[in-house]
């Protein structure tokens, strides 16, 4: 551009440096006419960054649609804000993360004392989390959270309105915030409604058949529940399969629901009621929180509101 130095052009387009308003407008107009786009790699180099952020999922997460949808949502948002997203493998040693040269990392469903979060804090790498870490003071930044207690309350109230009298929960141990909050919400709801809590323990990440032993004991007991809620993504499918083998009909004999929705729940027969945790939005908000942290903005994160998706598995036909 005639009469304007390369440095001034750079400052005008990047928003840095002192540039007169008129000059900035002329530079921006010229760039628009030329369809000029700044080189993000060069910009990151000037800022002393790589322009790459990491996304760490729990071990085995690739088997679950929730985490895949979250990763896709994060990737789309990263592209939109000029960042590259690297999906981190399950690292055998957390110290291996240093080799990636990441500007920051989003850790999804961190464990109670997550070694990756601890190592990132030691390295001085900015961290945000998908759900808070239960152990305080680990160095993690803001958390993108869902009010799982409130979401579960809405689901359990729906089961009660559908005729349930004894609602059991199929859940892993409370080793992360999602499960801990869900269990706490279930126990509080049971107290308010005068219902004895009934919990069957299953793995956090697994296939439907891995929950079937615990569910079989639950449904085959002398006082079986008339409604079961699965906390892990695939567990409600296991509940429905066991119920069928025991001669129980869903929803006439047993109401079945899930705390995590997936396409498999919509395609099951009958389709299974579930909480849509909106993983694509959660992924996008993780990137937003990390990008703000890298830009030196206040460490905040937008929450994600779950939605109850009612399907046939919890809608009993009218009697009489």
Locate each region found by the language model:
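Flexible loop/turn connectors
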Residues: 216-320
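Short acidic capping loops at alpha-helix termini that bridge into adjacent secondary structure
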Residues: 166-167, 197-199, 250-255
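Alpha-helical recognition/docking segments in bacterial nutrient-uptake
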Residues: 52-157
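Hinge/beta->alpha junction and helix N-cap segments in small-molecule ligand-binding domains
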Residues: 58-66, 89-93, 144-154, 170-214, ...
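N-terminal helix-turn-helix DNA-binding module of bacterial transcription factors
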Residues: 1-51, 318-320
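Short beta-strand segments enriched in small/hydrophobic residues
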Residues: 8, 45-61, 158, 166-173
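Short, well-structured alpha-helical segments in soluble
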Residues: 92-102, 211-223
């Amino acid at each position: 551009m005639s009469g304007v130095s390369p440095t001034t052009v750079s400052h005008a387009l990047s928003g840095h440096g002192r540039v007169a308003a008129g000059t900035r407008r002329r530079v921006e107009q010229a760039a628009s006419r030329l369809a000029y786009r700044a080189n993000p790699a060069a910009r990151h180099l000037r800022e002393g960054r790589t322009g790459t952020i990491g996304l760490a999922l729990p071990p085995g997460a690739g088997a679950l649609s929730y985490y895949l949808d979250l990763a896709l949502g994060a990737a789309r948002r990263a592209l939109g804000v000029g960042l590259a997203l690297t999906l981190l493998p399950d690292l055998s040693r957390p110290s291996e993360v240093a080799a990636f040269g990441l500007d920051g990392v989003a850790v999804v469903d961190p464990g109670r004392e997550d070694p990756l979060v601890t190592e990132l804090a030691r390295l001085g790498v900015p961290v945000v989390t998908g759900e808070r870490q239960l152990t305080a003071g680990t160095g993690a930044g803001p958390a993108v959270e869902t009010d799982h207690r409130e979401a579960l309350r809405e689901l359990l109230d729906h089961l009660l309105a559908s005729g349930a009298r004894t609602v059991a929960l199929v859940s892993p141990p409370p080793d992360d915030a999602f499960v801990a909050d869900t269990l706490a919400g279930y126990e509080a709801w049971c107290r308010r409604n005068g219902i004895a809590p009934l919990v069957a323990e299953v793995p956090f990440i697994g296939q439907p058949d891995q929950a079937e032993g615990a569910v079989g004991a639950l449904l085959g007991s002398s006082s079986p529940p008339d409604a079961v809620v699965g906390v892990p993504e695939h567990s409600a499918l296991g509940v429905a399969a066991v119920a069928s083998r025991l001669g129980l009909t869903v929803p006439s004999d047993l109401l079945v629901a899930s705390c995590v929705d997936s396409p498999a729940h919509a395609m099951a027969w009958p389709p299974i009621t579930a909480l849509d945790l909106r993983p694509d939005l959660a992924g996008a908000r993780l990137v937003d929180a990390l990008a703000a942290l890298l830009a030196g903005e206040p460490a905040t994160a937008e929450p994600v509101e779950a939605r109850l998706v009612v399907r046939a598995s919890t809608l009993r036909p009218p009697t009489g």
